[in-house]
Amino acid sequence: FYAFSGHKIYAAPGTGVLYGKRKWLDAMPPYMGGGEMIATVRFSGTTYAPIPEKFEAGTQNIAGIPTFVPAIRMAENMRSPEIVSYADDVKKFLYERLSEDDRITIYGRPDNLDLKIPLFSVSVRKAHHEDLAMVLDKMGIAVRSGQMCAEPMMDRFGVTGMLRMSLAPYNTMEEAEYFVQSLDKAIKMVSQ
């Protein structure tokens, strides 16, 4: 199986793709019921619609689905050499600045920064990730805070959660610098 979430490329939440071999999809029972997924219902049993309908209970995401194709096109356009080069420069700048701060632990340090996706998961000594996220939000910066659906990983690193920042291809060097300055201010505010 392959699964892909549309919101990872800026499509609306609840969009995506599930790809599986027909023999497995045919053999799998639906995990929900309702809507057009049922062909017939009798006291003797239920016959499900063919795939993919048998897995599509209820009303489809009619507001989100139209965002999926434009998001794919935008993602394709973001692969131009100029955009990739600039985004890599922003990523490297942010990584270097975060690495210089001895209060910050970066998880997943890469051997080759060129291969690293533009996402940084960090913890900050004497500052709770949720407090930092709240202060950064007040500064106009969106980050993710918590266990990132990966509680065993948090246990492995001995933390209750992390702060995660993700860069987009349209983020600027100025925004990365603003983030570094704002994170420094937030750390000072919540660690006192």
Predicted regions mapped to residue ranges:
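Pyridoxal 5′-phosphate
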Residues: 1-192
